[in-house]
Amino acid sequence: MLDLTELEKSLGVKFENLSLLEQALIHTSWVNENPNHLSGSNERMEFLGDAVLGVIFADRLYHDFPDIQEGDLTRFRSLLVRRESLVRVALGINLGKYLYLGRGEDASKGRFKPANLAGAFEAVLAAIYLDKGIDATREVIFRLFKTEMERVQTLSSNIDYKSRLQELVQAQFQLTPRYRIIDFSGPEHNHLFIAEVYTEDKVLAEGSGRSKKEAETSAAKEALQQFENSFTAEDNI
């Protein structure tokens, strides 16, 4: 059995049942060369880990972004659980070093193959879940995926507002909101743009940003806020 002490430290988890972590590291190629190994490969644990990862991120996104619709929540979750994200995290904890691989797979750089790393990482999450429960697994995921979660936070501030405003305005008034830059200031390399969103001859709101897109997004967000405030006021009458 490999010494998994350093891997436990990287994960921030001390296993009660270390055989779960070992099982998560066993690739099918190793099982094929060791037929007497009774517990099989990590594929079943990979299945469980994938589900655990998905539900933890779905829960986090649902509570962090109450105003964002299902389509964008799904896109955010896909960004978090995609193979590239899993591989980055797996490389960060040097997971490939600990994989049980068959000789041929090892010789063909199997310790660095994205599919092997992503699958093993999902299996490791399953091992943590089975050994420590959902709360401990959640803590590990949020710590290891900090970079990906920060990216989603940034994306959430720049998307959705324009499409949501368009849906609202079209539903309420059968009009399509448009955007225009009405002013800018500051040096050429660091302009501050002012945008307004309007329908026909009615200005709905203004917004500002360091790019035209950011200014338009800000205007859409402000317009949405005004609509929401007006709806709330009507409800209270």
Swiss-Prot record:
Gene3D superfamilies: 3.30.160.20, Ribonuclease III domain. Disulfide bonds: none annotated. Mg(2+) binds at residues 46, 122. Residues 160-229 form the DRBM domain. Its cofactor is Mg(2+). The keyword Transcription regulation does not apply. Its EC number is 3.1.26.3. The keyword rRNA processing applies. Residues 4-133 form the RNase III domain. GO terms for biological process: mRNA processing; regulation of gene expression; rRNA processing; tRNA processing. Signal peptide: none annotated. One of its GO terms (cellular component) is cytoplasm. It catalyses: Endonucleolytic cleavage to 5'-phosphomonoester. The active site is at 50, 122. Keywords: Cytoplasm, Endonuclease, Hydrolase, Magnesium, Metal-binding, mRNA processing, Nuclease, RNA-binding, rRNA processing, rRNA-binding, tRNA processing. SMART domains: DSRM, RIBOc. It is found in: Cytoplasm. Belongs to the ribonuclease III family. Homodimer. Digests double-stranded RNA. Involved in the processing of primary rRNA transcript to yield the immediate precursors to the large and small rRNAs (23S and 16S). Processes some mRNAs, and tRNAs when they are encoded in the rRNA operon. Processes pre-crRNA and tracrRNA of type II CRISPR loci if present in the organism. This is Ribonuclease 3. The lineage of its organism: Bacteria, Bacillati, Chloroflexota, Dehalococcoidia, Dehalococcoidales. The gene is rnc.
